[in-house]
Amino acid sequence: MQQRRPIRRALLSVSDKAGIIEFAQALSQRGIELLSTGGTARLLADAGLPVTEVSDYTGFPEMMDGRVKTLHPKVHGGILGRRGQDDGIMAQHGIQPIDIVVVNLYPFAQTVARPDCSLEDAVENIDIGGPTMVRSAAKNHKDVAIVVKSSDYPAIITELDNNDGSLTYPTRFNLAIKAFEHTAAYDSMIANYFGTLVPPYHGDTEQPSGHFPRTLNLNYIKKQDMRYGENSHQQAAFYIEEDVKEASVATAQQLQGKALSYNNIADTDAALECVKEFSEPACVIVKHANPCGVAIGDSILAAYERAYQTDPTSAFGGIIAFNRELDAATASAIISRQFVEVIIAPTVSSDALALLAAKQNVRVLTCGQWQARSAGLDFKRVNGGLLVQERDLGMVTAADLRVVSKRQPTEQELRDALFCWKVAKFVKSNAIVYARDNMTIGIGAGQMSRVYSAKIAGIKAADEGLEVAGSAMASDAFFPFRDGIDAAAAVGITCVIQPGGSIRDDEVIAAADEHSIAMIFTDMRHFRH
């Protein structure tokens, strides 16, 4: 198989025009003939480039409002023709070989994301000719290059210059992989969209059936191969969504340290998503996907020091997340006090990074600033299937709360209750969080019995010499019995925030009244399994 193929003729037809003029200019300057369609051809002609309209080349006009432009044997024969094997039949029918195809597809995802998108709008943004050319060129990658991403334009020009106007087989093969990935993702988007519609009962109006299509097609891009997975005998890789806009562990930039492990990524995600809940300077320390210390303060240094106090033992080898820039003072406090696997923050100051450079094993990530969280889906793998649900973006404010006890919470208790409620959302069920003065005092996670989570939170606080009396307690789900309230009262909890909804709510409320505990219902549960 000949490794290089000279590029003499290009077909360009793009919806995303970014960089296309410059790329076409570079091709033309290297003696490559340009074929193009519709708006792309007009854009190139207006830029003064010598371009031949596909309709002039085929002798067949664009028709049906642009639905039929490139679906012609002279186009697909030029792409699919096997060099050295189909040359005779191509010459017989006046088919010129096309050596590189540059195509990206109608913006279907952006169209259906619009609130006012109709089914007709969606249908008209289903590209037919584009995917057909992409697949044709990718199939014939032995002879033809296919470019579907504008980010590849510079590398293409560089390789042409380095190879006397030719592209190598490895390049064409890698471009073909991208092309098939591109069309697979495109068809998946269309199938997922149509799968959320139910057929009309009257007239021609489709009705949405919710977020979940009949067949779920997922497309993720491999970001990283890993040494191993959750355990050393498991192979693993990290895949990310394409074009993620939200600040996340998937989009974070690593500034130093070893490659992130499977467990690093899972724990960093838990820490970052928790710290996003707070508008004040906040710090979250996570171990094994559970917060072991959370606090807010006047600065991130104060927040870190208070979060660390909750459970210094568990913080060893943990993940630390901030919602403000990591400064030198905080970086110094961390590395002088504890071993840490990962630190993630929106940004890191140059002074902080210089200090951390002395600890090259510490992985330092920046994720950028974040806005409101975007809606999306969560997945949980089960044997033979996939559980799919909306992300848990539920939150409450003081206005949403119901006080069900005889005693009203004080202003301080209310603040503490809202604080530990935010934390409880990120603790594995059964989850109990004790907090006071915007700092976790004790956290009980992952117990099969809720009362034991409450007891563990109290034990944690006692082990660190933290005063529980006067603290608030959050529970991620309702109390099925009064025993959890009795356990909380025994260590001095004075306010409890929980969803409510148990058939024994009256019994639980009576226990709170018996202990003069203020009890708040959120009417929202935050199970986390």
Curated annotation (Swiss-Prot):
Kindly give the CDD domains that the UniProt entry links to this protein.
Answer: IMPCH (cd01421)
Give the record's GO CC terms: cytosol
The family database entries (Gene3D superfamilies) matched by this protein are listed as: 3.40.140.20, Methylglyoxal synthase-like domain (3.40.50.1380)
Q: Which residues form the MGS-like domain?
A: 1-148
- Catalytic activity field: (6R)-10-formyltetrahydrofolate + 5-amino-1-(5-phospho-beta-D-ribosyl)imidazole-4-carboxamide = 5-formamido-1-(5-phospho-D-ribosyl)imidazole-4-carboxamide + (6S)-5,6,7,8-tetrahydrofolate; IMP + H2O = 5-formamido-1-(5-phospho-D-ribosyl)imidazole-4-carboxamide
PROSITE patterns, per database record: MGS (PS51855)
Pathway it works in: Purine metabolism; IMP biosynthesis via de novo pathway; 5-formamido-1-(5-phospho-D-ribosyl)imidazole-4-carboxamide from 5-amino-1-(5-phospho-D-ribosyl)imidazole-4-carboxamide (10-formyl THF route): step 1/1; Purine metabolism; IMP biosynthesis via de novo pathway; IMP from 5-formamido-1-(5-phospho-D-ribosyl)imidazole-4-carboxamide: step 1/1
Q: What is one GO biological process annotated to this record?
A: 'de novo' IMP biosynthetic process
SMART domains the UniProt entry points to: AICARFT_IMPCHas (SM00798), MGS (SM00851)
Family annotation (PANTHER family): BIFUNCTIONAL PURINE BIOSYNTHESIS PROTEIN ATIC, BIFUNCTIONAL PURINE BIOSYNTHESIS PROTEIN PURH
The domain comment in this protein's record states: The IMP cyclohydrolase activity resides in the N-terminal region.
Q: Which family does it belong to?
A: Belongs to the PurH family.
- The name under which this protein is listed is Bifunctional purine biosynthesis protein PurH
